[in-house]
Amino acid sequence: MIFPIFFTFFLLLSSSHASVQDFCVADYKAPDGPAGYSCKKPAKVTINDFVYSGLGIAGNTTNIIKAAVTPAFAAQFPGVNGLGISLARLDLGPGGVIPFHTHPGASEVLLVVQGTIIAGFVASDNTPYLKTLKKGDIMVFPQGLLHFQVNGGGTPALAFPSFSSPSPGLQILDFALFKNDLPTELIAQTTFLDAAQIKKLKGVLGGTN
């Protein structure tokens, strides 16, 4: 009898801030912190804080990766602050690609609604998992693992990724390596890539040295 009572008490103590209150709409006038935005005063909350219309507009895919991500994270959608969820729109033009990247703060579920997308991730033991996804398919990407999406057809593809955090974070591997001022010689030593290729990639992505 004691254990169930203790367990219930523990669950109550470990409840999130959002479960103590009905919601915690982001207050953009206050600074953002590791735990998210401060809560807007309830008297200033409106229905518009819980509605976001930006995902109905196609992203601009006329760029080097032929892709666009339109986020509805806490920074854009105040109503998701503190709720442990968020959403985005992914547009992939023909030949479009989202390079290897990670979300340090969230797992991801990808729903394909148009076209064909080749998606995959690499586990911590370096085992790759990949699948060609079509309309109606969903795929999960565990938190923190490197993953990618590639347009697998000759027509535009559209998907909606959702996340287990209002601020999932993002680090793109190619940008981390080549869109910076790390010395080419150091990158060559740590990646076993040819210096000429590294300089070429730095030139394409905006890196120096």
From Swiss-Prot:
GO MF: manganese ion binding
GO BP terms in the entry: auxin-activated signaling pathway
SMART domains, sorted: Cupin_1
Disulfide-bond pairs as recorded: 24-39
Signal peptide interval: 1-18
Domain (Cupin type-1): residue spans on this chain: 53-199
Keywords: Apoplast, Auxin signaling pathway, Cell wall, Disulfide bond, Glycoprotein, Manganese, Metal-binding, Receptor, Secreted, Signal
GO CC list: apoplast
Chain residues that bind Mn(2+): 101, 103, 108, 147
Residues annotated as glycosylated: 60
Compartments it resides in: Secreted, Extracellular space, Apoplast; Secreted, Cell wall
Function: Probable receptor for the plant growth-promoting hormone auxin.
UniProt subunit comment: Interacts with ABP20.
Family from the record: Belongs to the germin family.
Protein name in UniProt: Auxin-binding protein ABP19a
Originating species: Prunus persica
